[in-house]
Amino acid sequence: NGFCIVRGKDPKAKGQKGDLLLLLKEQPGNSQILEIGVICIDGQKYPEKAWIDVTGKLVEL
C-alpha cells in the first residue's frame, strides 16, 4: 500500500492494488491548482498498472 503525488498541467499516474494516487492539475499559464483527484487503486474500477488522469479516466500514454 503505497502512494503517489503528481502535480502538473496534465497529471497522470498508475499504481498497484491498494495504492493511493493524488493528482493535482495546475492552471495553464501559472501554478495555481485547478483540480484535485484522489484515487485508490482497487483492481476493479481502477485497475493495476493502468494510467489514470485527474478525473479518474483511464488514459493511454
Predicted ranges, named:
Residues 1-61:
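Short, glycine-biased loop/turn motifs at secondary-structure junctions and
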